[in-house]
Amino acid sequence: MACLSPSQLKKFQEDGFLLLEGFFTADECVAMQQRIGEIVAEMDVPLHCRTEFSTQEDEQLQTQGKTDYFLSSGDKIRFFFEKGVFDEKGNFLVPPEKSINKIGHALHAHDPVFRSITHSPKVQALVRSLGLQMPVVVQSMYIFKQPHFGGEVSPHQDATFLYTEPLGRVLGLWIAMEDAMLENGCLWFIPGSHTRGVSRRMIRAPSDSGPGTSFLGSDPAWASNLFVPLPVRRGGLVLIHGEVVHKSEQNHSDHSRQAYTVHLMEAAGTVWSPGNWLQPTPELPFPPLYS
């Protein structure tokens, strides 16, 4: 059943995250993985777009904010790569399918397989059971977490990058395409951390000025013992509150940890910050989730 029970809703409200095991079938996961394989096989990335995507905090401005390729990807399907996968001439040092960190940020809009999954009746029923009245899809990503060098994702709150007024209007759906275990970089959360507001925001600069983005505020030094791991079997879905603190470790294993993620916003009574890096465009306004 796609709808949350009262006890599940209560747990999500208390913790800021919730695991729903077996939400998607193996066949649905296979369909998404096969489609991603086709997209990667057809990938033709110009040399100037071979941008190393880093999840290390101290490199974020350089690799994300200053790169037009990233900042203009909100309404497109684009490829972002792991560090060290190109030589100095921009040639692949590893097989191309092993080089990608993620594909973003509009699979939900431009690909029929991912559009169907994103707007599936059971996803709609799940989100309705959370009480969202007018949810819109703001972004989607396919994350690879490659074996041996799939990068660490530092502790963060999604609302740092996807800020709304009031807060509490962003919801992440994290779908495991493969088993996500301790060995290959599963998610970790600080339960209850979604009740403390947002400590930092990434702001997009005006197009005619300086670096692409900057940060306002700073994150506290979250103690490592506050985090709890959340292993997820293939097909599981994790609900993620926009302000809950979460992270993942580098993948040192022999197995990838692929996931499809979607971020939603409750549009009713909500202002999407004009300072967010991601903005709706005339070509792609944020599409309603509900049919």
Swiss-Prot record:
InterPro entries in UniProt: Phytyl_CoA_dOase-like
Keyword Phosphoprotein: yes
Positions with a binding annotation for 2-oxoglutarate: K102, M141, H156, Q157, D158, W174, S248, R257
Record keywords: Dioxygenase, Iron, Metal-binding, Oxidoreductase, Phosphoprotein
Role according to the record: 2-oxoglutarate(2OG)-dependent dioxygenase that catalyzes the conversion of 2-oxoglutarate to succinate and CO(2) in an iron-dependent manner. However, does not couple 2OG turnover to the hydroxylation of acyl-coenzyme A derivatives, implying that it is not directly involved in phytanoyl coenzyme-A metabolism. Does not show detectable activity towards fatty acid CoA thioesters.
Family to which this protein belongs: Belongs to the PhyH family. PHYHD1 subfamily.
UniProt protein name: Phytanoyl-CoA dioxygenase domain-containing protein 1
Organism: Mus musculus
Gene name for this UniProt entry: Phyhd1
